[in-house]
Amino acid sequence: SDVCMLERSVLTAGSSWHAAGGIHTLNADPNMSALQAYTIELLPEIEAESGQDIGLHMTGGLTMAGTPDRWEWLQSAYRVYQSIGISDCRLVTPDEARELNPIMSTDGLLGGMWADREGYLDTTGTVHAYAKAARKRGAEYYEHTKVEALEQTKDGWRVITDKGVITCEHVVNAGGLWAKQIGRMAGIELPVSPLKHHYLISDTIAELENLDFEIPMTVDLEGFTYLRQDQKGVLLGIYEINHEHWAMDGAPWDYGMELFQEQTDRIENELVMGFERYPALQDVGIKTWVNGAFTFSPDGNPLVGPVPGK
């Protein structure tokens, strides 16, 4: 309970407010897979304890492979899942995958993996659910409180903010787009950088109107895309091959709820592959584009753990 969180702006500012909200357990690192599975199990508990709706849709998830190497990797990941106790998944053929996601073309696919504990949620609702549950347990959070400096003492830290000074034993850097600057306040250089990331939301798709179930979260490893249902349309996200860094030294302090103009030329190849994988997209319009910033480490996983000497 002796914990407080400082938010420079308002909860969700930066990346959380515009995130696509996909949840999944598949990860190249089995430790991360186990952590992600634990988080998914925790979500209903957080929702119940906070009383905050998180918009949880447990649709299940497909991850599809179209080259021998990726198909072998998926089969290996499946075996790792079994070894660490994630048993609610199975390998599927392209035909089985098409039954699970009827708007997906299986041309060129060799197989995939189905996982029960995948889907998506409302990121804004989830952030507020965590905050409410934490406050119920005695923790606190303060919005509109900017960290300006960190001073290490023999007993811990002095956190200098624009509202005053907080003394504590430990500081956790959860700065997101501002993690680089927070790290430098503690005298460390973190290998993180904000990148621009696209997704689109389509207009209504007729095939989805006729289904009595929600299509699963689907990742196409060959097309560098992920897809989930959004009402009676879909959200198609792009893993940019030609990625673009932004604000390499950390986002401006006054950045918070902004987006960038979409850059369709930069993601043209992925868009073509996505529209071929989901042909229904070729017949509908695009309702919304989102091009927002997220902070990434070199391997895409979070930086977690103590800093030596700090």
Q: Which residue stretches match the model-derived regions?
A:
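C-terminal catalytic lobe of FAD-dependent flavoproteins
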Residues: 123, 222, 258-310
